[in-house]
Swiss-Prot record:
Localization annotation: Cytoplasm
Source species of the chain: Bacillus licheniformis (strain ATCC 14580 / DSM 13 / JCM 2505 / CCUG 7422 / NBRC 12200 / NCIMB 9375 / NCTC 10341 / NRRL NRS-1264 / Gibson 46)
Residues annotated to bind substrate: T156, K182, T193, E279, N401, T406
GO molecular-function term, one example from the UniProt record: L-glutamate N-acetyltransferase activity
GO BP annotation list: L-arginine biosynthetic process; ornithine biosynthetic process
Name the UniProt record assigns to this protein: Arginine biosynthesis bifunctional protein ArgJ
Lineage summary: Bacteria, Bacillati, Bacillota, Bacilli, Bacillales
Amino acid sequence: MIQVSQDSIKKTDGSVASPKGYLAKGVHCGLRYSKKDLGIIISSRPAVSAAVYTQSHFQAAPIKVTQESLKKSAHLQAVIVNSANANACTGEQGLKDAYEMRRQSADMLGIEPDLVAVSSTGVIGEYLNMENITKGISLLAETEPAEGDFEEAILTTDTVIKQTCYELMIGGQKVTIGGAAKGSGMIHPNMATMLGFVTTDACIEESALQRALREITDVSFNQITVDGDTSTNDMVLVMANGCAGNERLHEEHEDWPVFKKGLQLVCTDLAKQIARDGEGATKLIEVEVNGAKSNLEAQIIAKKIVGSNLVKTAVYGTDANWGRIVVAIGDSMAAVTPEKVEIRLGGQCLFKNNEPQPFSEELAKTYLENSEVKIEVFMQEGEGKGTAWGCDLTYEYVKINASYRT
């Protein structure tokens, strides 16, 4: 955890369009029946940019096009995103369509194609309706920015938009970091579809931004799970356009920890919003592991627990079945000494010294009825700490995914 003064960072009611020099739009172009389905984020000038991508062998066409754009100069000025269609597993035609989305967006803005990132989310294995995309890009050119339109345009089975914003003080200058995300099902990212877009007006060194994003993604977006599946389209992208006018940030700068903490808060906030909005979910589950052999092992254990379908269903059924947590810990391949492990729920110790502990089933059940549930695990193997987030598994999840294409 990055430690900085709370006075230097504050959360605001802003969005991905709040940092200086950005605007965001969303329109309905016909990929979905009636809801918005095409969005764009635009920076007033080229922004230093970084991204992390899905580790799936079946990377979607837009991922490949965005990687190519960033490889050229590590700068972007826009990102175009469609929902309802992932443009994944669509062969050469899918790649051509992604390039065409990039070209049309660049022409609309009067910029080079390499300054545009492309992202898609939705059904896998169907070709994009480029007639609708072309119409949508024309609509974006004519449409005025409106709060929440971009965030709505990138949703699929999500039930709510996901956005956040923080303000920081860097060298006496106000710096803003905003973010938007989508994700509800198929969430088990290892950089689901899980998409995250972060904007900042900070001036920052390219390599420092990429390293920070990679490190922070590992403890935020990569620590959430809804159903254990990794998508073909997962991506987290950050743009930094320098409009705040701060002294250029790098890893040795005295205010680097402040910026890095702000970025971590934005990514963690978005990750938790995704976990909370898991398909059919009624509860956010947080698992905190302390005393593991290393931070990595703590993260592995936490994610193993929160990803267990048995744990998820127990939480849904308000059943303090700690045996399911033990099973997940034992299956994590981390260093485990059973006699040292302690499991706590709602302030009650359920398991310690490799044996059950007396606890109130009634109090545990009442605690599990909350919309947020925290499971604490103490390993006593070292100093490692890790947290993961997920949601309960309900009948509604099966219902949603049984009829996803109908």
